[in-house]
Regions:
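Conserved N-terminal helical subregion
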Residues: 1-72
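Active-site phosphate/pyrophosphate- and oxyanion-stabilizing loops and adjacent acidic/basic residues
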Residues: 10, 96, 150
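Structured helix-beta-strand junction loops
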Residues: 18-19, 92, 159
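Short acidic-hydrophobic surface loop/beta-edge motif
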Residues: 39, 87-91, 156
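Short coil/turn connectors at secondary-structure junctions
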Residues: 40, 104-105, 159
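Conserved FAD-binding catalytic core of PHBH/FMO-like flavoproteins
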Residues: 44-135, 139-143
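FAD/FMN-dependent oxidoreductases across multiple families
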Residues: 118-184
Length: 184
């Protein structure tokens, strides 16, 4: 199944807040981090790459630029009752994925390493139509583009601080993959 990051995050947060053993802190004051070691928490889970904890303990990163661009869009199509099968095609330009969202919408991720094709949005939309075998497409929304990069933390934990999610593995534009890789 595919869900938006916000829906997933909100659902997870709601369930975690019901657990009396978990405390949430909305940290506005940077001094909070310097006092964190003195609080005696058994475990601290850090998912944020912008805070002092990450910068101090987890900023030793392995970075890679894949010299590719991922284009994403939503196709609007005729209703399909069981639109629940993702498809991926390995084209000579790069992988193209059709990821169902609803009965009438499907998300597209087309990772392109062909230097000439990266600049030709009309051709990209033509290729989406060409490889599409399931949908009667009514509309293809504007293409968004993201450079494909990897950022991997060389340290997964420090004492009682655990790096998690995108703070551990960040792969763009595959939103959420850092979290998925952590679960694996």
């Amino acid at each position: 199944y595919m869900t938006s990051y916000n829906n997933f995050f909100n659902s997870l947060e709601k369930k975690l807040k019901k657990n009396r053993l978990i405390k949430f802190k909305n940290i506005q004051n940077k001094e909070f981090y310097s006092k964190l070691d003195k609080k005696g928490y058994e475990i601290i889970i850090n998912t944020d790459t912008t805070n002092p904890l990450f910068k101090k303990y987890f900023s030793n990163l392995l970075n890679k630029n894949y010299d590719s661009i991922a284009f994403t869009t939503i196709i609007k199509h005729s209703k399909i009752e069981n639109n629940n099968i993702a498809e991926q095609f390995f084209t000579k330009y790069g992988p193209l994925a059709f990821l169902p969202i609803s009965k009438t919408k499907t998300s597209i991720v087309f990772s392109i390493f062909d230097k000439n094709l990266k600049k030709n949005r009309t051709k990209i939309k033509e290729l989406i139509r060409h490889y599409n075998k399931r949908y009667q497409i009514k509309d293809i929304t504007d293409l968004l583009e993201f450079p494909i990069n990897l950022s991997l933390s060389r340290n997964y934990y420090y004492k009682n601080i655990l790096s998690f999610g995108d703070a551990l593995h960040k792969i763009h534009p595959l939103a959420g993959q850092g979290f998925n890789m952590t679960l694996r």
